[in-house]
Every structure is written in C-alpha cells, then in structure tokens.
Swiss-Prot record:
Keyword tags: ATP-binding, DNA damage, DNA repair, DNA-binding, Nucleotide-binding
The name this protein goes by in its record: DNA mismatch repair protein MutS
A Pfam family per the record: MutS_II
InterPro entries: DNA_mismatch_repair_MutS, DNA_mismatch_repair_MutS-lik_N, DNA_mismatch_repair_MutS/MSH, DNA_mismatch_repair_MutS_C, DNA_mismatch_repair_MutS_clamp, DNA_mismatch_repair_MutS_core, DNA_mismatch_repair_MutS_N, DNA_mismatch_repair_MutS_sf
SUPFAM superfamilies: DNA repair protein MutS, domain I (SSF55271), DNA repair protein MutS, domain II (SSF53150), DNA repair protein MutS, domain III (SSF48334), P-loop containing nucleoside triphosphate hydrolases (SSF52540)
Role summary: This protein is involved in the repair of mismatches in DNA. It is possible that it carries out the mismatch recognition step. This protein has a weak ATPase activity.
Family: Belongs to the DNA mismatch repair MutS family.
Record GO biological process: mismatch repair
One GO term describing the cellular component: cytosol
Length: 856
C-alpha cells in the first residue's frame, strides 16, 4: 500500500514498520495497540476488529484498527496460532513527561515458535522452535520450548531426517540457515511450520555460553548458537531460564518416522487430529500439565536402554503395589502448578503475584509428596523422594511476603503483607487515617448542611469531591463549596480542606503502590536465582506424575509388566489393542496371542476385511512402544525384544498433500523399511501392492516379502489379500501363515476376531460388500464374475496377462437368476424402515410391490 501524507507519529510508525516488514506491528497509543494500513486491513479480518481510518478528514485517510492493551495477549495469540509474527511496539517513556514525540520501540517479536502465553488447551502441548544448520557431514538440529526453557540438540546425516524430525516434533517454527527448496518450504508450511531466517546479534551473550557448556560437537554448537541468538533477537531481554542444552543421539531411542507415529495414532487421532482416540488419550492419567507433556515426549522417543526401561518399570511396580501411597501422591500433585512454565514467566519478568503464590503452593505440596515417598517403605520410592529438593526457604520467602489472595496485577497495590516493610506500613496507616478522616468529614458535612444524602466520592479526573443531589443544591454553603462538575441528577463540589487532605491521601497511596511494586520486583528477582532448581524439581515431579499414571492404568485396565528377550522372540498372551479395548464395552474385546520364536521373522496374515487384521498388527506395535517407555501393557503376559525401529504401511491417514499417489506413498514407506530396517526392527505392512494392477501388486508384495525374509530379518506382520502368497511358506523357512477367523452361517458372515494358524480359505469380500450395503444387482454381478474367475483358474499367476478382464461376457449361469428390476425391488424392500410407517402405509407398499412383480 502506498504511504500517505504523514504526521510525526506516523513517520515514527513507518520507521519501525520498515524493520519488521513480515510482522504485524502492534503500535502502542495510550490505552490501545493500533494497527495501520495493510496490517489494519488484514488484522481486522482475522481478528474481527472494526476497520476505521486515521485522519478521516484528509484526502488519503489511513486504515486503522485497534485492541485494548489489557486484552492484547489474546489477539496476539490468535495471529501467532495462524502462523503470523507480531512485533509489539511499546511507549518507552511516560507520555505526560515526554518532550515532543513519545519515544517508542519494539520490546518483543512474538513468533509461532516463541509464544509464551499458553491457554488451557495448550497446557500439555510443547511449543517448539527448531534451529537447523548445515555443515560438511550433515545437519545440526536444536529445538527449544521457550515457555519452559528446555533445549535439546542432535545431528543427522541426511536432509530427509531433518524434515522427519521437524514433522515428528510438530515444531511450530524452524530457523533454517541454508537453501530450502520451494517444495520443502511448501510442505512445511502446509504442516503449519513457519520458516524463518536466522537473526544476527553483535557481541557475545552469557546465555549462549551457558547453554553450550556441555556440548563438544561443532555442528551441535552452531545449531544451539543460532537458536539462542534468534530467541535473544526476538525477545529482546535476558533469558535466564534457558537450560543447558541436552545433546542426544537419535539412535538412543526407538526410531519412528512421522508417518509411523501418525499411522499408529500415538498422540492424536488420524481422523480428527485430536487427542481422543490416540494412545496418549488412553494412557494419560497424569495430574499435572508437566506430566502430560513428558508423557508425550516419552511416546515419541521410546527407550532402547534396557536398564532405563527397567528403572521406570520399578517405579511403576512400586506405585502399583501401594494404593494408598499412590493416592496420596495424586492428591498432593493436584496442588502442583506448572513449575516449568512458571519458571519461564519469572525469567521473562511477567509473572504476576498470584502466579508466585501458585509457585509457593506447589513447593508446599512438594513437601507432602516427599514425605509420602520417604515413608512408603519401598526403597525405590524412598530413594526418589530423598532426591527431591522442596525449596522450603523459597516457599517461605514468598508466602511471608505476599498476602493470601493477591490481585493479578502487581501495579495496583494490595499484594504485600503487613510487617514486611516499615515504610509501607506507614503509608498504609496514612491512607487509612485519611479514609477515616473522609468518613468523618462526610458525616459532619451532612450535619452542617442538613443534606442527608451528601456523600464524598473519588475519580481520577477530579480527585475527591462532595456530591449533592439536584434537590438539595439550594442547601449548599456557597462560601465553602466550589462547584467542579454538573451532572444530570447531582452537582459535585470541592473545599480547600478536602483538597488538602486529598493531596496527603493520594501521595500516600502513590508511594504505597510504588513501594509494593518495588518489593514485588525484589521478590521476583530473588525467585529468579532459583530457576534452575525449580526446573529440576519440575522434571522430577513430571516423571513421578507419569509413573503414577502408568500404575493407575495398569490397575484399572489389568495391564501386565512386560519382560524383554535377548533372543529376538515375541510371546504375547491375550494381547489387546489399548485404544480399541478402551472404547469397547467391558468384556467385548476378543484378545489374541502373538508368538514368534527366534526362527520366525514373518507372519503372513490373511482374512476378510473388517476382521481385525490391521488392529492385530497395530496392537503389537503399540504394546512394544508402551513397553519401551516403561509402561505396563494390555496383555496377560508379554515377552518382547527391544525394537530399534518401527516401520509401517498401514494407511491410517495417507499423506497425499505432497502430490504423491496412494501407491507412490505405499512404495515410499515400503522402501524406508527395506533400506533401513534391521533384524531388531518391527515392520507392519498392510495390503502392499493394492494400488496397482493385480499381478504387479502381487509380484511386488512377493518380492518385498522375500527381501525382508532373506536380507533384513526384521519381525514382520504382513497382511494381504493375495492368497497366492500364502504358498511362500513352502520356500521361505522363517515365514508362517496365520489368518483371522471368520465363518458363514445362514448366508451371513460372522467375524471371529481370533487369530488362527494357517492361511484363510477365502476372503469373503462379497460378504463384506453386502455388509456395507451395496445394491443387490452389484453383489449379484460380483458373484457371477467370481465364479467365472474361479472356473477359469484365473487365480493362478499368469505373467502373460497384465490385468484381469473382469467385464467380458459371463458364461456362468446361476439357477433362477433375478431380473435387474427384481433386484432393485429387493433393494427397496430391504431399505424400508417399518418403525417409521403406519399399518396403512405398509399395506399400500405391499400392494405396490405385488403390482410391480405382476408387471414384470
């Protein structure tokens, strides 16, 4: 938009806006933040603001919109959630004291990856900013949640791993130092990831050296430096809560591509994108927001270290065995607020009095938790409790300073206890004395004037005043009262005596409020020195919260403690899908065993659609993941290897936004397993080859099975409708056939949902189509085609034919075939809802059907 003729204030605005062209500029004017020109036009649409104009009388009025400064956070969050950046421009001096134009400047650039304000729905969500640097030999990745100060860093060799990490982390913003292709930029933006350029800062900053202190790898150091510089440049303040960066190897954890996590629905449903319906939803019995976030992190990075897994299991077992200890801990955890994010607000300087009191209450609750653990009688719980520092002195300093129920704002007074400061107590005494004097004056003036409804009031414009109703104005003593304001129903007056005491009272109030804020700021700075200890305490309580949740899950859902095999064998007795089992009525889920000895690497699974093949496959993956995060699992017993990777081609939600066909996605995911799986991996393939010609698909599926068998050796569950593939067990020694049982009774298909040895004898595809409600004429045609194919032996693989000629004339003749019109009539009859018809209407329908049959 071309710039209009400007005032000095607008010149100042343009100078600041030029520095942040890609951000909405919230420009402080009095009690409002204003947006101008394109920002106003676009912002008014997104934020549903009234679009008005500045300088309406000029030839070129400037589009303008505004938001109250008290409500600015909600408007900023709305923009940031949609992927925009917001520059906050504040008045840097008191307008009353300014000489000329008020000095203004940017105090913070809020971006999707640096959002501090979190709503109730975000309490269990981490908000990651990720930094990526490219150097010879690979890429460094550092990511941080600014609200908690945590920083993690790793390095990878390949660019594809970078993209996978960004998607798996669900990072909100990536700072990328390098050339990003247009297609990758588009892919990230479609995943709601904002791509930003690195920032620059002059000189060295203490935060950088502090967070890098444990790092030795130059690539990781570069990634962390780029991350911290961006945070400092955007937040424009000290970031004392940033934690020492934790370096990790991706190979330390069970690796799962973003598509695998999505297919398995670990943290959100593939259909709704919400928590409900996910494994996280089932397991999340956590009490604190910190515990919920940690559980999510564990689900995305299951352990490979058997020692660490067993340590977690020990804690879960101890809590499972002691109901009363567990319940006491839960009760105490209810009094623990989000210490990690409270620490961040302390560091940012925007923590309010109530939040500091929440911190103190959390520390008091921590004392009870420690006492419960130490007195439990269990050595593991005792040791855990002894390792927690409750920060007792800090809690006392906060509670001794703040009143029990302080207001939210630290600038309005009424937050510091009596006895904390002698000067503050004197000011308050003066204020109270002044207010008593006002009450005494009001009573005396009523007596002097005879005006019973005379009252003394206050506002910020006139200060203290005497208000007299219109009916009593004649009684006002003109020699002492001076009229200051006339209202519809009353007049307001002042007296010399009232103004004299007003000055004393207001001076005491001003000094009291200023001193309270000073004392609060000192307390906040004292708390800031404890941030590292508070963050460590937050981590300990979060982990305890997850252990308690696992114990509750185990008790309520009858989970077992899994053991681990060094011989690469699986033995799950009566295993259940944790999510499906949770939503079905009690006792209705049919459990299944899964036993694969050391010599068996592939189970080839056949059976009809809807019979439960995919559920059975996912069940194993979810049980393995639960086991490797330290949880107990839904089974009577479970013995598992420690898997290093999980690969899936299940198709819970095909990722087609990149422009790839379903078959291309299928082949890409299959290739991931063939290229990277090891003998310690778990591979789940469902209907590989379905997206191409029949024989192409069958040939590819067979070749993939053979490669997995001969070259990879990973534990593999391979579901297929190509029944010809079941003959592979004759040549592949480590492959076995299993199938999902089904039976036919009176022409109806009944799913047994039970895994049985050997291949399925038929697929029951037409029966499933019938359950789906396909028209009878279609089902009849399909049955005819099936009989022709079976008669011709078309199920034998014939390399000379590329596609079955399904629509050639059908020579098979059925007994008493129905006409098409009769098929349609049967469809109509089957769809009638008798509960919605009157007896008379039913009789008329029957008559119509009889007539139709006679005409045919």
């Amino acid at each position: 938009m071309p710039r209009k003729a400007t005032t000095p204030m607008m010149e100042q605005y343009y100078q600041i806006k030029d520095q942040y062209p890609d951000a909405f500029l919230f420009y402080r004017v009095g009690d409002f933040y204003e947006l101008y020109e394109d920002d106003a036009i676009k912002g008014s649409q997104i934020l549903e603001l009234t679009l008005t104009h500045r300088s309406n009388k000029s030839e070129n009025p400037i589009p303008m919109a505004g938001v109250p400064h008290m409500a600015v956070d909600s408007y900023v969050n709305t923009l940031v959630e949609k992927g925009y950046k917001v520059a906050i421009c504040e008045q840097l001096e008191d307008p009353k004291k300014a000489k000329g134009m008020v000095k203004r400047g940017i105090i913070q650039l809020v971006t999707p990856g640096t959002k501090m304000a979190q709503g109730p729905d975000d309490s269990q969500e981490s908000n990651y900013l990720t930094s990526v640097v490219e150097k010879a030999g690979g890429y460094g990745l550092a990511y941080s949640d600014l609200s908690t100060g945590e920083i993690f860093v790793t390095h990878v060799k390949h660019y594809a791993e970078v993209v996978n990490e960004l998607l798996s982390l669900r990072t909100r913003e990536v700072v990328f130092a390098g050339n990003l292709s247009a297609s990758d930029r588009d892919r990230l933006q479609k995943a709601n990831i904002t791509v930003s350029e690195p920032a620059e800062l002059e000189g060295e900053h203490a935060e950088i050296s502090y967070v890098q202190q444990k790092l030795t790898d130059s690539m990781e150091k570069a990634a962390v430096r780029q991350l911290v510089v961006y945070l400092l440049a955007t937040q424009k303040r000290s970031l004392a809560h940033l934690q020492v960066a934790e370096s990790f190897e991706i190979g330390q954890y069970l690796q799962m591509a973003n598509t695998v996590q999505r297919n398995l629905e670990l943290t959100q449903s593939a259909t709704t994108g919400r928590k409900q319906g996910s494994l996280f939803w089932v397991l999340d019995k956590t009490t604190t927001a910190m515990g919920g976030r940690l559980l999510k992190q564990w689900l995305s990075r299951p352990l490979l270290s058997l020692d660490r897994i067993k340590q977690r299991q020990q804690m879960v077992q101890a809590l499972l065995d002691d109901y009363f200890t567990r319940e006491n801990i839960v009760d105490s955890l209810k009094g623990v607020y989000d210490l990690e994010r409270l620490s961040g607000r302390v560091a940012f300087g925007n923590v309010n009095p109530r939040e500091l009191l929440q911190l103190a209450k959390s520390l008091e609750a921590t004392k009870l938790i420690i006492q419960t653990l130490v007195e439990s009688g269990n050595p593991d719980l005792e040791k855990y409790g002894q390792g927690i520092d409750p920060q007792s002195e800090l809690a006392e300093s906060i509670t001794n300073c703040l009143v029990d129920q302080p207001p939210i704002s630290a600038k309005d007074g009424g937050i510091i206890r009596a006895g904390v400061s002698e000067d503050l107590d004197k000011y308050r005494e003066a204020m109270n004395g002044g207010k008593k004097w006002l009450a005494q004056m009001e009573m005396e003036e009523r007596q002097r004037t005879g005006i019973d409804n005379l009252k003394i009031g206050y506002n910020r414009v006139f200060g203290y005043f005497i208000q007299v109703s219109k009916g009593n104005v004649a009684k006002v003593p003109q020699d002492r009262y001076t009229r200051k304001q006339t209202l519809t129903n009353a007049d307001r007056y002042i007296t010399p005596e009232l103004k004299e005491h007003e000055n004393l009272i207001l001076e005491a109030e001003s000094r009291s409020t200023d001193l309270e804020y000073e004392l609060f700021s000192q307390l906040r700075e004292a708390v800031k020195a404890h941030i590292p200890d508070l963050q460590e305490l937050g981590r300990q309580l979060a982990a305890l919260d997850v252990f308690v949740a696992f114990a509750q899950d185990a008790e309520e859902k009858n989970y077992c403690r899994p053991s681990f095999s060094s011989k690469n064998e699986i033995a799950v007795k009566n295993g259940r899908h944790p999510v499906v089992g949770a939503v079905l009525p009690a006792g209705s889920y049919i459990p299944n065993d899964l036993v694969m000895d050391e010599d068996t690497s592939i189970y080839l699974i056949t059976g009809p659609n809807m019979s439960g093949k995919s559920t059975y496959m996912r069940q194993l993956a979810l049980i393995a993941i639960m086991a490797q995060i330290g949880s107990f699992v839904p089974a009577d017993s479970a013995k598992l290897p420690v898997f290093d990777q999980v690969f899936t081609r299940i198709g819970a939600a095909d990722d087609l936004y990149s422009g790839k066909s379903t078959f291309m996605v299928e082949m890409s995911e299959a290739n991931e397993a063939l290229q990277h799986a090891s003998s310690r991996s778990l591979v789940l393939f469902d209907e590989i080859g379905r997206g191409t010609a029949t024989y192409d698909g069958m040939a590819l599926a067979g070749a993939i099975i053979k490669y997995l068998h001969d070259k990879v050796g990973a534990k593999t569950l391979f579901a297929t409708h190509y029944h010809e593939l079941t003959e592979l067990d004759e040549t592949l020694l480590h492959l076995k056939n299993i199938h999902v049982g089904a039976t036919e009774e009176n022409g109806k298909l009944i799913f047994l949902h039970k895994i049985l040895p050997g291949p399925a004898d038929q697929s029951y595809g037409i029966h499933v189509a019938k359950l789906a409600g396909l028209p009878r004429v279609v089902l009849r045609e399909a049955s005819s085609m099936l009989k022709r194919l079976e008669a011709e032996g078309a199920r034998e693989i014939n390399p000379s034919r590329q596609q079955l000629d399904l629509f050639s004339p059908v020579e098979v003749v059925e007994e008493n075939p129905l006409k098409a019109e009769q098929e349609e009539l049967l469809d109509e009859i089957s769809q009638v809802n008798l509960n919605e018809k009157t007896p008379l209407e039913v009789m008329q329908l029957v008559a119509d059907w009889q007539q139709a049959l006679k005409e045919e």
